[in-house]
Amino acid sequence: MDVGELLSYQPNRGTKRPRDDEEEELKTRRKQTGPRERGRYREEEATAAEDTADDKKRLLQIIDRDGEEEEEEEEPLDESSVKKMILTFEKRSYKNQELRIKFPDNPEKFMESELDLNDIIQEMHVVATMPDLYHLLVELSAVQSLLGLLGHDNTDVSIAVVDLLQELTDIDTLHESEEGAEVLIDALVDGQVAALLVQNLERLDESVREEADGVHNTLAIVENMAEFRPEMCTEAAQQGLLQWLLKRLKAKMPFDANKLYCSEVLAILLQDNDENRELLGELDGIDVLLQQLSVFKRHNPSTAEEQEMMENLFDALCSCLMLSSNRERFLKGEGLQLMNLMLREKKVSRSSALKVLDHAMIGPEGTDNCHKFVDILGLRTIFPLFMKSPRKIKKVGTTEKEHEEHVCSILASLLRNLRGQQRTRLLNKFTENDSEKVDRLMELHFKYLSAMQVADKKIEGEKHDIVRRGEIIDNDMEDEFYLRRLDAGLFILQHICYIMAEICNANVPQIRQRVHQILNMRGSSIKIVRHIIKEYAENIGDGRSPEFRETEQKRILALLENF
């Protein structure tokens, strides 16, 4: 407490209710202090009837104690002081454990030791400013002891440990000393930190503010460790974190910062991780995601934070659909019907629903979803979006190009996977209304062909400069150039040309004649389309088996024979 506070001090009269701003300040002050300090404030409130002399006496004691703490903080942080701190921590932890065992039914006997333990945990936050000294936490078994305290009977202690671990694993701090960070993360992983954190999460009551903060800090530890060491995501998920996240997401609680954070951590765990995607499917996670997203089929998110959560859940769903077994679960869970509804409702969720459908139908694994999509009259939904991109795309970050990319990818998947009567229904769409959909396809073709020609000209100029400098264009550089071309519009152009090849091979003369007629009118040729499709075939199937790649290449190139 500083001099200003002392001078402005007024003893608590006990009758007047604190103003809202005073109440808020009191709450903030409570949050920033440990249990011992919080106890002090509670005493001040409870003893409102004490006279001014006693209040002043207590104030002087507080000032003296704060002064002593400041003197202690001024001690320079080095190996010796950290070792001393760890030794004090171990002693207090052991003493508290001993007293709890000796007097299990008499809290008065061990409460003082618990407050002392909490105090030293708070002091250890200073170690987070020196990641080079993290090795001492491991060598002196402090990490092991801290992990043990995550199961402490008093959640105030476990929350204090979580708060400390969150600060120690702060990603910026970890990058300050790679060596110190590696040692700490190794010790945490070896100690099964994820399993212990989940066990602690299970008992926290989020209606209590401090415990809700504990949940938030726990999720921050996971995020920090996942960013520093992505491979730990699999262990964390298997040690119960994935199950807890799903349970927390579907809990009937008002939307808050913790629910948003859960959605974010879930998306992180599923990123490029087939094991976690499979585990989520086994835990009925696809149904949980669909249930949570169903809220947004007719209602827009009410805040920017709720919209961010919605996008995280959509990202998680798209990630899961990379796995064929989850496509089946998505189909059985009526995911197609939900996404189709979202497209029709024209809410903020529409753009993301389109992306989900793209992931659900792509490749041979999407065949069943493609057939079901036609059964639920999805063609009536997708073609209006193909004919005209929404003028106002409300979702932040969604562009007209992304919209057209997903729509064309969906149509390409439908043409690849549909058979029989459903394929006929799809092809008939290209002949109705004087082949207006063929006209739209050709319009998009020239739009993205033009964009590609601009990008290719720029890349050729860069290649020329590289050669002129006497440098060699290696495979890595060629890959980089190809990725840039895909991003500039080649990706969508390949899908457009593939759609052209498919519909021209459908034995519907009207379609083929219209395609050739428009190409001639615009001074273009089949050769350009053939070249784009050949390049598409050469680069298809990355990450798949050689057999699939070879079969798919033959199938695509066969389309060119009758084009």
Swiss-Prot record:
<dbReference type="InterPro" id="IPR016024">
    <property type="entry name" value="ARM-type_fold"/>
</dbReference>
<keyword id="KW-0677">Repeat</keyword>
<dbReference type="GO" id="GO:0019899">
    <property type="term" value="F:enzyme binding"/>
</dbReference>
<keyword id="KW-0539">Nucleus</keyword>
<protein>
    <recommendedName>
        <fullName>Beta-catenin-like protein 1</fullName>
    </recommendedName>
</protein>
<feature type="coiled-coil region">
    <location>
        <begin position="476"/>
        <end position="540"/>
    </location>
</feature>
<dbReference type="GO" id="GO:0005813">
    <property type="term" value="C:centrosome"/>
</dbReference>
<dbReference type="InterPro" id="IPR011989">
    <property type="entry name" value="ARM-like"/>
</dbReference>
<feature type="repeat" description="HEAT 2">
    <location>
        <begin position="134"/>
        <end position="176"/>
    </location>
</feature>
<feature type="modified residue" description="N-acetylmethionine">
    <location>
        <position position="1"/>
    </location>
</feature>
<feature type="repeat" description="ARM 2">
    <location>
        <begin position="229"/>
        <end position="273"/>
    </location>
</feature>
<feature type="repeat" description="HEAT 1">
    <location>
        <begin position="79"/>
        <end position="129"/>
    </location>
</feature>
<feature type="region of interest" description="Disordered">
    <location>
        <begin position="1"/>
        <end position="81"/>
    </location>
</feature>
<keyword id="KW-0175">Coiled coil</keyword>
<dbReference type="InterPro" id="IPR013180">
    <property type="entry name" value="CTNNBL1_N"/>
</dbReference>
<comment type="subunit">
    <text>Component of the PRP19-CDC5L splicing complex composed of a core complex comprising a homotetramer of PRPF19, CDC5L, PLRG1 and BCAS2, and at least three less stably associated proteins CTNNBL1, CWC15 and HSPA8. Interacts directly with CWC15 and CDC5L in the complex. Interacts with AICDA; the interaction is important for the antibody diversification activity of AICDA. Interacts with PRPF31 (via its NLS). Interacts (via its N-terminal NLS) with KPNA1 and KPNA2.</text>
</comment>
<dbReference type="Pfam" id="PF08216">
    <property type="entry name" value="CTNNBL"/>
</dbReference>
<keyword id="KW-0391">Immunity</keyword>
<dbReference type="GO" id="GO:0005681">
    <property type="term" value="C:spliceosomal complex"/>
</dbReference>
<feature type="repeat" description="ARM 4">
    <location>
        <begin position="325"/>
        <end position="363"/>
    </location>
</feature>
<dbReference type="GO" id="GO:0043065">
    <property type="term" value="P:positive regulation of apoptotic process"/>
</dbReference>
<dbReference type="GO" id="GO:0000398">
    <property type="term" value="P:mRNA splicing, via spliceosome"/>
</dbReference>
<keyword id="KW-0007">Acetylation</keyword>
<dbReference type="GO" id="GO:0016445">
    <property type="term" value="P:somatic diversification of immunoglobulins"/>
</dbReference>
<dbReference type="InterPro" id="IPR039678">
    <property type="entry name" value="CTNNBL1"/>
</dbReference>
<keyword id="KW-0597">Phosphoprotein</keyword>
<feature type="modified residue" description="N6-acetyllysine">
    <location>
        <position position="91"/>
    </location>
</feature>
<dbReference type="GO" id="GO:0002250">
    <property type="term" value="P:adaptive immune response"/>
</dbReference>
<feature type="repeat" description="ARM 5">
    <location>
        <begin position="364"/>
        <end position="417"/>
    </location>
</feature>
<feature type="compositionally biased region" description="Acidic residues">
    <location>
        <begin position="66"/>
        <end position="78"/>
    </location>
</feature>
<dbReference type="GO" id="GO:0000974">
    <property type="term" value="C:Prp19 complex"/>
</dbReference>
<keyword id="KW-1064">Adaptive immunity</keyword>
<feature type="repeat" description="ARM 3">
    <location>
        <begin position="274"/>
        <end position="323"/>
    </location>
</feature>
<dbReference type="GO" id="GO:0005654">
    <property type="term" value="C:nucleoplasm"/>
</dbReference>
<feature type="short sequence motif" description="Nuclear localization signal">
    <location>
        <begin position="16"/>
        <end position="33"/>
    </location>
</feature>
<feature type="modified residue" description="Phosphoserine">
    <location>
        <position position="545"/>
    </location>
</feature>
<feature type="short sequence motif" description="Nuclear export signal (NES)">
    <location>
        <begin position="130"/>
        <end position="140"/>
    </location>
</feature>
<feature type="repeat" description="ARM 1">
    <location>
        <begin position="178"/>
        <end position="228"/>
    </location>
</feature>
<feature type="modified residue" description="Phosphoserine">
    <location>
        <position position="389"/>
    </location>
</feature>
<dbReference type="GO" id="GO:0006915">
    <property type="term" value="P:apoptotic process"/>
</dbReference>
<dbReference type="GO" id="GO:0005634">
    <property type="term" value="C:nucleus"/>
</dbReference>
<comment type="function">
    <text>Component of the PRP19-CDC5L complex that forms an integral part of the spliceosome and is required for activating pre-mRNA splicing. Participates in AID/AICDA-mediated somatic hypermutation (SHM) and class-switch recombination (CSR), 2 processes resulting in the production of high-affinity, mutated isotype-switched antibodies.</text>
</comment>
